[in-house]
UniProtKB/Swiss-Prot annotation:
Gene name as annotated: ccmE
Residue intervals passing through the bilayer: 9-29
Name listed for the protein in its UniProt record: Cytochrome c-type biogenesis protein CcmE
Cytoplasmic membrane side: 1-8
Database matches in InterPro entries: CcmE, CcmE-like_sf, NA-bd_OB-fold
Length: 155
């Protein structure tokens, strides 16, 4: 093999190795940022992976909200009306967080079946429901409770 061909081959191999490394790094970064959505039924049935960041959503069960007296720790139960899952969260809940309304929690599922959330998202008005929660509730055969109409001020 003459020196020119050898040099070209070396450049092509180096370029392919560089492209392969770049693709590997990009895919690894994307994989870390993927948060799959799971319903309480899927979590209770063991379909959600342990110690992997997931999104869990459903309706907050009435009477399930427990706040710690001396910290920002909160514990509540989310349901899709078939099964329920407990979610713990340390921080200030969104202003629109209420029992009986839809939420999505981002966090990790531990071995006890509790989602340890680092972020809680609440619906932003009385008619909005996160798409994943709406689909999960529809698939479970139950619809989200209808929001009461807001009185319109006349005058």
């Amino acid at each position: 093999m003459n020196p020119l061909r050898k040099k070209r081959l070396l450049i092509i191999v180096a370029l392919l190795a560089g492209v392969g490394l770049a693709v590997t790094l990009a895919l690894s970064a994307l994989q870390e940022n993927i948060n799959l959505f799971y319903t309480p039924s899927q979590i209770a049935n063991g379909e959600a992976p342990l110690d992997t960041r997931i999104r869990a959503g459903g309706m907050v069960e009435k009477g399930s909200l427990q706040r710690s007296a001396d910290s920002l720790d909160v514990r509540f139960v989310v349901t899709d009306f078939n099964k329920s899952v407990t979610i713990t969260y340390r921080g200030i809940l969104p202003d629109l967080f209420r029992e009986g309304q839809g939420i999505v929690a981002l966090g990790k599922l531990n071995a006890q079946g509790v989602v340890v959330a680092d972020e809680v998202l609440a619906k932003h008005d009385e008619k909005y429901m996160p798409p994943e929660v709406t689909k999960a509730l529809r698939d479970s055969g139950r619809a989200a409770p209808a929001a009461s109409p807001t009185p319109v001020k006349q005058g």
